[in-house]
């Protein structure tokens, strides 16, 4: 998919192996994840560090892969109508639906890495669906998977230089995970084209610890927990969905969803070099409740030209109880005016009320114009208006011109806007201070917004498809840790920083697609992304560390009716590190390290043994092009003890090597 990469929330390299989906360089926090059109927001329960990173796997793994019917990705202006968190784009995971006849499946998958220091995966899942009566049908699926953690010393020999008390520390590899989930759906078609769905889903993800900490340092507790479960995420959703359609062409989609996340993990430090490292062997649980009510109706009508208007409203409420992130002591740094030193509330919440309208107007047989408008009122950040305008123009039988512009937005997180969330640094994390400082939440933050623009030309003839798109996002009010103090403690010794809005940033690039029907049995599909600019205009630094270009290519051959073969290639361009350290000074030495371009190839084959049984086998990373994590992006340490962990630049993640895999799929 063009425009899509994996990256972290910032350029820090912290939690470097917890890469998530990034669309058009806007970062994972601006990628809205939906499951069957409903938001999945469990990652929001994970504490946001000083640099914006979260120790999370994201929200894309709550559905077993074999239960996914398709994945829809919206990019640019088209995503703006989805509101909060969709400034980069939307990933909608569509699950398999109920069936009119009784059907079931049982699937298994395993892989074997060539290198024993890389974690292997085993996975199994099942599904069952069918009718209960003329009007009632059901669907049930579940899965279990286990991925082992990488070896604790997988990056031995590749780490950046480390001295003093850090001499024997290593950046961690990829952590493992045990994933269990089940999903039940009861569908009632109570009248013609009128359906009411009742759904319950439960998921549990527990990690297998690989030794990672926010600053890649260690202690005895870190070492003793390697391979053990140190955090677990429970996600439960209850949903009711009403879909209706009438012979007039009017249709409606309405749902209510309650999502509860319990995020349980070992207690972590909140100060300086100990931020994100285990503080003791006790567990804390953060509870996030997310309630969403959504209603929309689409009405076709003729007023000069055929049109379809969509009108809708949405209500979202988030409530979080987080007893662990409001516990930073003020004994050393001094008291912060207006904030309780010892008894800060663990509760935070936000509400969003939304109205939206969109009109698809068929101006001519070859011209479709789609204006739209969304209004959001956030209980903390206030009002936001998001207008949009998209045009699709056929240029003869072979070409289509597409263009669009929209204002997208993202509200502050419950950590960024919570004044009781306090972090502390003795100096290295303080952008403009010579001594210690605090970072506290800010309830006066504005919502982030982005003016997203694109224009593209597409050629299509039979199964041929070629296209190129230019996109530009003018990003405003991005929320980051402040660059200048806004006050001092009551003793006047410690500066106070807040989360603040950064005035301007720009992301722009090119996307291309080329699909070639080589023959009746061979297809060659390609896409590419080239980043022209990705810059915070206030600091001059990059917004995220992503490849300069990415090219994906897939060659598929249906050799016989029962046998298919596939070859894949992904070519990643150069990845440049951040330009400036936390003090705003130019990076030096190994902090300037780049990741050179590299290519990952894959081969696979699927054979249908019978109409109900198929087997797939293949090799990922055929030529064993591995990448090793050297550390976090920039140098940190203690001049008094001469203990340093030198910066790794862009070398902040692991790319696994050659891996053999096999899957068996059965169905009836």
Region annotations inferred by a language model:
Residues 43-44, 476, 571-580, 606-668:
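C-terminal beta-signal and adjacent terminal beta-strands/loops
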Residues 107, 362-366, 470-475, 486, ...:
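Gram-negative outer-membrane beta-barrel transporters
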Residues 40-75:
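Short acidic/polar hinge/loop motifs at secondary-structure boundaries
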Residues 117-207, 234-236, 303:
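Transmembrane beta-barrel wall of Gram-negative outer-membrane proteins
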